């Protein structure tokens, strides 16, 4: 192969030109417009705006890459990097390479790009650096699915995003994540063409950003004691400090890293509410005489508000000056949500200020408070972003409203000519559960399945075309109250963040069967890159009933692929029978089940040795909660070392119902129970939580049949379960009737902290 004399690089141009002439003639004859069926077969996520399929394939196993300037080389290096990480071939740079990255000024929009694949080569074109980068990632997706022959189909892709703001929010205040994880998340966002990283850095539970002028914000505000057993050293009994913060050097590193991946970092400094960490660091900024001395370990809406004094605005100005210096992007998020006004109402000086300002009430005062910050940022060339509560006051025309109370805030903002981002609860809140499996991590218990998530419509019909232009985009928010580890964060984020990308980039017409196939391909790419995601919704779930003969009813929460099973102990394969209806099985059989998308295995294989005991055991997750006031999956506070269980409970009413429990022949109950600290700030609602008085100091588990007001058939003392952190087994005799009956499980106890939870129940 000839070499370029100037560079010494191999020159593929003569060969490529000859092949290209042949290819262009063939393509002109057989090029076809893509159909819906063709699009469904492409392993791309998000789906490009336009695709045209041509005849033939391109072999890239020995191809080289041509790139001429900084932007094209960065895109080429991204392709090389992703291929290397996913087990693909090593493609070197060469003048005249058959994979060519180049500028095309006719492609409008910095993020737009075109990818053309012919049997002779690949052409990736864009006018902007981001477009070149995204073109490289789309090409990698095609290559990652190519298989051992390393061939991709001839086609042409013209692509651009539907929305400018395609975001993910990470809450680093409730639980601190290391810099390496933050960068990994940003890298994964870039792979999905997500371009806005909203970094929630301050809250009641911690302050996470170094501010030179106020060192106590991190020396005091970054650290707390965890609730319950987790807050103490098991060897010494002394309190354990928990938390952390990001130094300025680390933040600059993260911001620079994000810039190389075309991701804008939007920091959030949440005020005037969610301010306990600030008040602990500087009590003079509080609205009460004796503010907390440390950040809180409680979850919920705390009443602590900053005092709207001149000292507070001096503090905020100094903080924002340092924040602006660290984050060069156009946006600064100032929170503004969930500001309970009780402390302002009770403070005479604050009431006097309301009158002096000529304001109506405390809500108007918050509007004035937020407007001062917005004006401060505007004078420094930044746009304020705030949660939709900021609409209650004077909102600058260039402010961005982040709509979390459903989509109403975005609609109001757009109709008033202001920009908005859709981040509605619950659908875009990534701390909601993805299935009701007992294997799910902690989080809010209202289930937002993948299909429900995908069906969200980011273009409200009530808006005109002109008003819709004010919808900058959408964002998924990961609040981390119940997500203490980065492994759990990955499971809550992925693959749902990829669905956010699909909605924000493609804004597609809904076609779940097609999308689920592409989602399976995206999951496969995560596995190739060795990146974590939540496989639990892909796993089969089973309910067993019967005694002499067992009926197994199967389902898969994700509704992706096909469940296939074996009953001879072998591992399921793509050729195993598909599950179509409940299975009738004999005790002694081993049922093995796994999902497949075509030949691709999904999730994990579940195995159940069939016995009557399966029908006599239920986890709490398989039961119904008696109430739905604050349903959560809560991570146990113990053991202090090792894996902790996650409990399914309504903290306002700890009570579980097992429908149709098979009581015939049962004489004893074995229950797995645990204790959790009550660390929830729920205001006066705490008075609504009541328990029956206990007969013994530790309390009892009470089991009733045929409803929670039905006959008491078991009372099991809990004293033995208090001797360990984590969970413990307790047991007791029951007085069962024959047949199937609903069982209701509740606890007796003296107070609400700690409170008992049920993990599973077995009838013997």
Segments (PLM) and residue ranges:
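Gram-negative bacterial Sec-dependent N-terminal signal peptides
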Residues: 20-36
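Contiguous, structured surface segment used for ligand recognition
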Residues: 40-165, 488, 504-529
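Feature activates predominantly on carbohydrate-active enzymes
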Residues: 107-317, 322-331, 372, 376, ...
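Surface-exposed loop/turn motifs at beta-strand-loop junctions within extracellular Ig-like
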Residues: 128, 595-599, 747-751
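Active-site neighborhood of glycoside hydrolase catalytic domains
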Residues: 296, 302-397, 404-411
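Flexible, acidic glycine-rich loops studded with aromatic residues
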Residues: 384-399, 405-550
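Short, compositionally stereotyped local motifs that mark structural "simplifiers"
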Residues: 513-638, 677-685
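Extracytoplasmic
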Residues: 607-764
